[in-house]
């Protein structure tokens, strides 16, 4: 239990040197943190930490491990809107922070670049782009629901199945349409 917490918190605090040390000591990059119910790779992806994601993947992190909700790494990568929408929502003040599940991470200009770099790494590592959560949602469902155009495009270009129904009998297209309608209604 203590070992899984050490690696998780090293990733969570984005302490790259400690992550490397722990991985070199044989800490399991696939261990689920029973306290937060997250996997170190999921935390690195959520915080858009490219370097720690690389270290975890090169040390045996499985890109298809699910958390307690059945979410995979692509689900987590899809949960945030793309940078232009985040800037609009947060009014892009200097030093703006975005919620990183249990922490806040700085909203950086290279947010989308990091997102795509991590997405490519995960795809190369054979992460399943059509993995369904316990609610039947694929990463494309989530990216569509959150209006994450960057990830929607990424998934579609790589053959994501647009016909998978979630537990509400919705396809990703339904969520994309609803997302556009919500944005339209906010203007009025």
From Swiss-Prot:
Which UniProt key words apply to this protein? Answer: ANK repeat, Repeat
UniProt xrefs under SMART domains: ANK
Q: Where are the ANK repeats?
A: 2-31, 36-65, 135-164, 168-187
Q: Which domain of life is it from?
A: Viruses
Check the record and name the Pfam families matching this protein: Ank_2, Ank_5
- What GO annotations for molecular function exist for this entry? NF-kappaB binding
Protein name per its UniProtKB record = Putative ankyrin repeat protein FPV230
Concerning InterPro entries, the annotation shows: Ankyrin_rpt (IPR002110), Ankyrin_rpt-contain_sf (IPR036770), NF-kappa-B_inhibitor (IPR051070)
- Gene3D superfamilies named among the record's database cross-references: Ankyrin repeat-containing domain
């Amino acid at each position: 239990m203590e070992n899984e917490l050490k690696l998780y918190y090293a990733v969570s605090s984005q302490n790259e040197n400690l992550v490397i040390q722990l991985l070199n000591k044989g800490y399991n990059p696939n261990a689920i943190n029973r306290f937060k119910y997250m996997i170190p790779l999921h935390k690195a992806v959520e915080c858009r930490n490219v370097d720690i994601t690389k270290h975890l993947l090169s040390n045996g992190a499985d890109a298809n491990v699910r958390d307690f909700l059945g979410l995979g790494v692509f689900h987590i990568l899809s949960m945030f809107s793309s940078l232009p929408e985040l800037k609009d929502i947060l009014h892009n003040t200097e030093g703006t922070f975005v919620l990183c599940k249990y922490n806040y991470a700085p909203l950086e200009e290279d947010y989308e670049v990091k997102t795509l770099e991590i997405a490519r790494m995960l795809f190369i590592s054979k992460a399943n782009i059509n993995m369904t959560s316990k609610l039947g949602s694929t990463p494309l469902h989530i990216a569509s629901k959150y209006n994450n155009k960057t990830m929607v495009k990424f998934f579609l270009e790589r053959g994501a199945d647009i016909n998978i129904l979630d537990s509400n009998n919705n396809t990703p297209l339904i969520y994309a349409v609803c997302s556009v309608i919500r944005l339209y209604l906010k203007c009025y």
